[in-house]
């Protein structure tokens, strides 16, 4: 049986995490630099659309997520980041839908 698109996406997320984690030190954690590279390389339009392409956004996200303050993001912490990004993307999605709807149904 083949993987569903969602299953394939999950495997790709896991692979991506390990691919970037392997760049420096521990293969099971991301440094700030690895996280920045992962997000900028894999979500450039998304980060740009949120107006959060500046490094401080990723730095603040990293610091807020690194609960044990070891300057590394483990996979569980990375999942928290993904959840936040998905929420932000969902909000952006609705803003775009609303803008299109309002443009099509303008009273002016």
Swiss-Prot record:
The keyword Iron-sulfur does not apply. CDD domains: S-100 (cd00213). Keywords: Calcium, Metal-binding, Zinc. Gene3D superfamilies: EF-hand. It comes from Gorilla gorilla gorilla. GO terms for cellular component: cytoplasm. GO terms for molecular function: calcium ion binding; calcium-dependent protein binding; chemoattractant activity; transition metal ion binding. The keyword Metal-binding applies. Ca(2+) binds at residues 66, 68, 70, 72, 77. One of its GO terms (biological process) is endothelial cell migration. Residues 53-88 form the EF-hand domain. This is Protein S100-A15A. Pfam families: S_100.
């Amino acid at each position: 049986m083949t993987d569903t698109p969602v299953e394939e996406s999950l495997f790709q997320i896991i692979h991506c995490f390990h691919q970037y984690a392997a760049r420096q030190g521990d293969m099971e954690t991301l440094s700030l630099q690895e996280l920045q590279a992962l997000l900028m390389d894999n979500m450039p339009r998304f980060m740009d659309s949120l107006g959060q392409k500046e490094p401080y956004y990723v730095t603040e996200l990293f610091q807020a997520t690194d609960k044990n303050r070891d300057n590394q993001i483990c996979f569980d912490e990375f999942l928290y980041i993904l959840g936040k990004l998905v929420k932000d993307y969902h909000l952006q999605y609705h803003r775009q839908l609303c803008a299109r709807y309002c443009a099509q149904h303008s009273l002016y």
